[in-house]
């Protein structure tokens, strides 16, 4: 099974083209975990950096026409150097423009995984789910949404919510770890996309296990953070979450994982 130890040994360079609001939090989270983030946003620079990268995150949270072109350029370069790319289609169910951009990136470029909440992923496959911007109401059929997207796009899918679902090659697992504090801190979902990009390329042909490990590490770190003194307060939780990403071990994952 792909391990946190392997991530720390490889320390993959992860190029993050992400939401302006979350860049600092994302970079600190990846460093704490053991990856090496770069927040590059210029095609010529990406040409230089991606040849050394272990992963690329495309997060469409701060969406403009210029950024759309940047996403396209980055994905072309990533494919050139066989760098696994993860798409976070932020709020793609909230409006036609975001949906159009997400559809373009999925249909015309090579992706290693898509990570989104239930509302976002459901919108990509035409399933009706109550959603509001970047947030999504709790749903009971999250595994069905993940499988539907996996079957439609033939891409590994991670759907997050109160329960998380991972679908790869028609197989689905659900993760029942996590903290209710996570949605109360802006950027936790965006950082998760970067964490997925850190793990997805560690072992070729082991995408399901890599994604499962990424989700378990992330969610169990959230549980650890909430248990710290004042971890029930969002400001403290944010700091303790970074600390927990730094301290979590494979032994913690093995002990506390809840997978079905």
From Swiss-Prot:
It catalyses: 5-(2-hydroxyethyl)-4-methylthiazole + ATP = 4-methyl-5-(2-phosphooxyethyl)-thiazole + ADP + H(+). It comes from the Bacteria. Its cofactor is Mg(2+). Substrate binds at residues 39, 187. Keywords: ATP-binding, Kinase, Magnesium, Metal-binding, Nucleotide-binding, Thiamine biosynthesis, Transferase. Catalyzes the phosphorylation of the hydroxyl group of 4-methyl-5-beta-hydroxyethylthiazole (THZ). This is Hydroxyethylthiazole kinase 1. Belongs to the Thz kinase family. Its EC number is 2.7.1.50. Pathway: Cofactor biosynthesis; thiamine diphosphate biosynthesis; 4-methyl-5-(2-phosphoethyl)-thiazole from 5-(2-hydroxyethyl)-4-methylthiazole: step 1/1. ATP binds at residues 115, 160. InterPro entries: Hyethyz_kinase, Ribokinase-like. One of its GO terms (molecular function) is magnesium ion binding.
